[in-house]
């Protein structure tokens, strides 16, 4: 309950859709709570601060998974002191200062790694409560913000990792990664598959091709999966890759056990109705799959957060890593021909998932808000030279 007017500023980023999805889940949850005294605003800090440079960086980021893996690996695994000397630490400083002094939020929620926040907390003594939502399953130094009052984490293991570098445990909350509440609702799998002209009695393999950013090789992969698992059916989600959808639709037009889709708003229904999923191990996608208890095969995860997520899920028994399409086909055949193994993996996921993670996170944020200082006590401390940043 918010008894006086309060404002939350969410800092997000559009490097991949996951951070935006987390932000939207939090915003929607607060709307459902119907809190008259709460204002929630969101800003893509880097895009707003440096639109052209950010656009270039985003293209590099996307292509790094395909062409510059070693470069991205070096950045991801670089030491904290190396990052501290990097310009990236100051990226967006002017825009952030403008936002804070104009909007005067009572709490800042980071859904994207924002190293520049440490510049404000360390140098400008702006005592605003800061909370961080980590959207992956292994610790990474970019998420560490000095003086952050709360870190919302996916697992107890991740909590132990944060505690091992000296972050007090009372600042660490295991809420799970925020996802839409629709992944908690019951789905009639038989009805869903039937209305999409698929057989409810066949094991359904869900492939999310849009996550890979490439168009080649999927036709052969689907054909080999069907050859090795003739009792199964395949649903291929092509995302916004229209060329891939057109090509695969033509190739499999006479197959009643293959469904080719483009962009869909029904990943929830497809996850709920499938027995196995081939995907990239993005933090949000695998959190949704964990909630839906659908085991996964991670095809060629890139070094960095993808690989770390995949290794964690494989260690827990929720999925398997396949570094090549051939290995993925072998894994699909092995699992679809061993339904008890698939069922065991699904049961492990059900026992480990954290339901209603977004609601739990938002309830804790409200608790932080109710104990935050009045904005005049916070922003009155800002030195004059800092206020000169404001335009």
From Swiss-Prot:
Cellular component GO terms held in the UniProt record: plasma membrane
Catalytic activity field: a 1,2-diacyl-3-O-(beta-D-glucopyranosyl)-sn-glycerol + UDP-alpha-D-glucose = a 1,2-diacyl-3-O-(beta-D-Glc-(1->6)-beta-D-Glc)-sn-glycerol + UDP + H(+); a 1,2-diacyl-sn-glycerol + UDP-alpha-D-glucose = a 1,2-diacyl-3-O-(beta-D-glucopyranosyl)-sn-glycerol + UDP + H(+)
Keyword flag Lipid metabolism: yes
Sample GO molecular function, one term: 1,2-diacylglycerol 3-glucosyltransferase activity
Highest taxon of the lineage: Bacteria
EC number assigned by the record: 2.4.1.315
Pathway this chain belongs to: Glycolipid metabolism; diglucosyl-diacylglycerol biosynthesis
Function (record text): Processive glucosyltransferase involved in the biosynthesis of both the bilayer- and non-bilayer-forming membrane glucolipids. Is able to successively transfer two glucosyl residues to diacylglycerol (DAG), thereby catalyzing the formation of beta-monoglucosyl-DAG (3-O-(beta-D-glucopyranosyl)-1,2-diacyl-sn-glycerol) and beta-diglucosyl-DAG (3-O-(beta-D-glucopyranosyl-beta-(1->6)-D-glucopyranosyl)-1,2-diacyl-sn-glycerol). Beta-diglucosyl-DAG is the predominant glycolipid found in Bacillales and is also used as a membrane anchor for lipoteichoic acid (LTA).
Protein name as it appears in the record: Processive diacylglycerol beta-glucosyltransferase
Source organism per UniProt: Staphylococcus saprophyticus subsp. saprophyticus (strain ATCC 15305 / DSM 20229 / NCIMB 8711 / NCTC 7292 / S-41)
